[in-house]
Amino acid sequence: MAYYRTPSDVTALPAWQALNKHRQAMQNFSMREAFNTDPQRFSQFTLSSAGLFLDYSKNLITTETRDLLVSLAGEVGLKDAIKAQYDGELVNSSEGRPALHTALRRPVGDKLKVNGVDVMPDVHRVLNQMTELVGRIHDGLWRGYTEKPITDVVNIGIGGSFLGPELVSEALVAYAHKGVRCHYLANIDGSEFHELSMKIRAETTLFIVSSKSFNTLETLKNAQAARAWYLAQGGSEVELHRHFIAVSSNNAAAVAFGIREENIFPMWDWVGGRYSLWSAIGLPIALAIGMSNFKELLSGAYTMDQHFQSAPFEQNMPVLLGLLGVWYGNFWNAQSHAILPYDHYLRNITKHLQQLDMESNGKSVRQDGTPTSTDTGPVIWGGVGANGQHAYHQLLHQGTQMIPADFIVPIVSFNPVADHHQWLYANCLSQSQALMMGKTRAEAEAELREKGMDEQEVQKLAPHKVIPGNRPSNTLVVERISPRRLGALVAMYEHKVFVQSVIWGTNAFDQWGVELGKEMGKAVYQRLTGGTEEQADDASTQGLINYFRGRHRG
């Protein structure tokens, strides 16, 4: 029986029971001692694939831990689940859909049927449509209402229509096509639109309205604001089609807005928003870095797809990272996971991974509707590593919670300045080393005595200088952030999330919690604006509505 129809109670499986016992045996495990006694530890717990090098040796694991986690993956049927996803089975059971974002990066000639129809010709037709548009804009052939070429592209979208494309276009700025600047408009806060409008000219700006339904509130409101601004700047309704295109499955609504049908790029219901940067949602990426680099991005992701499908679990990067997350979340009570990129251009990867992980695995029922028997997705947080060292790394080192971390660092900088990059790389390694090693009481005391401090002061200050250590982390190293390697990196995290959903028996491809807030937002808006005098369902919400109505001006 398919895993998504009858998910296992993972806590009843033999491997889970064995992991419980193993966890007790690991209570006093010391990574410091493990490295001191096993010269092969680094080589045993490292691997490379698709241009990524993973060091997971700084984890609270032994080879037995890895074997037990791999056994757990086998017992929940992970191999069959991976095949089910790639074959287009209805792994998104609550919506009755497949989850086939991986199809978007498959090469020409592959075949994949959904409801009996091969979808691959459509996938490559849209890629060709994107290639044509990008070429026309980059060659200066797509012109605005004053016949000037396009210089600015504004992507209007939110969630997956924004976070992934923004991450990639900023991470690959070294590959940017000169002459076209890309901007993102997501928030419904008018200040964001105001600031953007100060940077662009209507006559040379192309807006991409990215919304599957063409009815997403924030996106539609921003599109309407952009349309009104364009008209106020001298644009006309007749020439609107030169300045607005859409990525949507609702052609009728896009056409009614003023977008020509040939400038509407399709979306499929088998691609979820947070997995959609590989589709026409990635148009701003292609416009930023060129279509050949966009295809390199797809190629890197496809290489990771192949690794995920074929590598044995004990040598499978996404599988191991997913299993380590289960190990810490379910057996060590870790509640969050830090993503720490040591690269300025990767500064937005944490935001993308927050949505990818938390929207996918923030679930409390299994695929069959029964409650989960374990904790599920952690809080994902973090930020640029060097900056974080002077902010929240303190909590990682001396806080009371265990917070596993992923360090991500390139070997080569696109913009070398003196020895800055050597220091950046050194800081990345030293942070993971410090988390693992810590500082003992004896070491703290010896350090203070060396400074000539009297014994009373030593004993007073030493407890504050103790760093527990034994804090787990992974280090992901790439030679440099290229389209191909970035594609592999993002795809790796997609697969990691899927692995964990299979272990927990949850659906990684729906997001009903998001829908509830949207529906309630409409009702609150009606009460705020006087559309209804009906009271809110609770006194707090009604009180805040009244507070707003009594003070709002404008």
Curated annotation (Swiss-Prot):
GO CC annotations on file: cytosol
GO molecular function, one term: monosaccharide binding
Stored PROSITE patterns: P_GLUCOSE_ISOMERASE_1, P_GLUCOSE_ISOMERASE_2, P_GLUCOSE_ISOMERASE_3
Catalytic activity of the protein: alpha-D-glucose 6-phosphate = beta-D-fructose 6-phosphate
GO terms under biological process: gluconeogenesis; glucose 6-phosphate metabolic process; glycolytic process
One matching Pfam family: PGI
Pathway it works in: Carbohydrate biosynthesis; gluconeogenesis; Carbohydrate degradation; glycolysis; D-glyceraldehyde 3-phosphate and glycerone phosphate from D-glucose: step 2/4
Active-site residues, record numbering mapped to chain: 359 (proton donor), 390, 518
UniProt subcellular location: Cytoplasm
Lineage top rank: taxon: Bacteria
Keyword hit for Cytoplasm: yes
Keywords for this protein: Cytoplasm, Gluconeogenesis, Glycolysis, Isomerase
Record-listed E.C. numbers: 5.3.1.9
Primary location recorded for the protein, binned into one broad class: cytoplasm
Keyword Phosphoprotein appears in the UniProt entry: no
Function: Catalyzes the reversible isomerization of glucose-6-phosphate to fructose-6-phosphate.
PANTHER family given in the database record: GLUCOSE-6-PHOSPHATE ISOMERASE
Protein family per UniProt: Belongs to the GPI family.
Protein's name according to its UniProt entry: Glucose-6-phosphate isomerase
